[in-house]
């Protein structure tokens, strides 16, 4: 395991002791804003809240969570495809897709900010992603499959894009109306 993976794992392990942050639900305005780049002076605050973000993601349960989903308009996100007893956390600061395959793959997606809503989304099958880790080191990884989908989904959040934006207008509107109805029933 690399030093970066050990650091990410240690931060994720602290989630067991952290109170989960509330996850915003669409149509919250923060979810539609493009985030600002994380600067070195932001890192102390980010390190402080990361365990609570992991806690929220694991409790939901989810495999990815972006800062806007917890009300922060900053460019960072978490992913973890591992099982509870074998976590594989990745903390991505200022991530970007730097290359993508021409081959596309369709995969069913959901989102913690659109609870109980799912749809098949077509994205590049393989991507190369660059990001900074919490120590400021530049990371780069070529990924495919579910991890590629998850990373692209979380990076979309940092651009103010939801998975439903990749669907037809009709399908997107059906999902958003259904979500609004479910949220209204939940409040009453």
Question: Where do the protein language model's features map onto the residues?
Answer:
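Positively charged
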Residues: 1-188
